[in-house]
């Protein structure tokens, strides 16, 4: 059976991309609802545990501004090593490796993006190699096959276009979820599965979205509300889909998806800040969140106007 987790990074900021990722693994049926923090221990663990394991947890616990990307990076690159992707040496490589077949080239309209940032950027190669080998050993012992991993980076112009068409920034989440689920289901066309999605925004009813995604299946609502549960039924298989807030606290795959998304977004924000530092040397870097984003916009506005960059190319409308 397949276990799939989906989570995002960057839903709230005014600057930078919204990144959403899906991670999947194929596990024996007796492990479909198992606690993978225990199944894969000691190779992986939460941040509260001591030791040299890979951190898989809420990305806000793994990454703290000012402390660098090493924690995120060790985990992401160790899990990528379990896949058949070619080596990723730059941000552009990473985005290319993880994009779905239907996703548009990432950040093509962002003035600050060049994709040349070297990865890994902070973690030592020896630490990644050690974590990777321990992970592969744990996966083999549990008979778990890891992958695929997909990510979608919705740049500011595309984000604003979605808001204009649908009147809600929550629509951007729906667009990304549909693309990611379509890619994951295509990868596993004949197997049952469990999909857990970290829920954001006020939407409680997802049956129409799932039915549009799977027109040849029967979508059955099991529960709709703060937590929404559906079964997507085909004659040969059933996929159970659960959407709930703070799913990264209880789902290993969702926590890992949050880490992948956060890692990509932080690499993007490094390029964002470097671009504006080149044009406005005195400007202090921003994470892009409301409040500080307003300060940053005020600092760069004169340069923005001289460059004749439209506001909706760098500033999200919602």
What are these regions (language model features)?
Residues 1-318:
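RNase H-like, Mg2+-dependent phosphodiesterase core
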């Amino acid at each position: 059976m397949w276990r799939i987790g989906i989570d995002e990074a960057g839903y709230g900021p005014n600057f930078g991309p919204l990144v959403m990722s899906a991670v999947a693994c194929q596990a024996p049926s007796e492990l479909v609802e198992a606690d993978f923090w225990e199944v894969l221990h000691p190779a992986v663990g939460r941040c509260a545990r001591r030791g040299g394991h890979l951190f898989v947890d809420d990305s806000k616990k793994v990454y703290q501004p000012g402390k660098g990307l090493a924690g995120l990076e060790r985990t992401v690159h160790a899990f990528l090593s379990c896949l058949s992707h070619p080596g990723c040496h730059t941000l552009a490589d990473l985005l290319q490796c993880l994009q779905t077949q239907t996703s548009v080239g990432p950040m093509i309209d962002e003035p600050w993006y060049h994709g040349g940032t070297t990865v890994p950027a902070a973690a030592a190669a020896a630490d990644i190699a050690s974590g990777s080998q321990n992970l592969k050993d744990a996966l083999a012992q549990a008979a778990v096959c890891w992958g695929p991993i997909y990510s979608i980076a919705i740049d500011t112009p595309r984000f604003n276009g979605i808001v204009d068409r649908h009147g809600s920034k929550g629509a951007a989440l729906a667009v990304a979820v549909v693309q990611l689920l379509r890619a994951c289901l295509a990868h596993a066309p004949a197997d049952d599965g469990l999909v857990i999605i970290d829920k954001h925004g006020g939407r409680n009813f997802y049956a129409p979205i799932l039915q549009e995604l799977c027109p040849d299946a029967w979508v059955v609502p099991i529960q709709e509300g703060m937590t929404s549960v559906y079964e997507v039924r085909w004659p040969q298989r059933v996929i159970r889909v659960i959407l709930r807030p703070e799913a990264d606290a209880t789902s290993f795959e969702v926590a890992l998806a949050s880490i992948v998304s956060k890692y990509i977004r932080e690499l993007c924000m490094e390029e964002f800040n470097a671009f504006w530092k080149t044009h406005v040397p005195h400007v202090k870097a921003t994470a892009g969140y409301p409040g500080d984003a307003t300060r940053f916009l005020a600092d760069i506005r004169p340069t923005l106007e001289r460059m004749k960059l439209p506001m909706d190319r760098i500033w999200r409308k919602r």
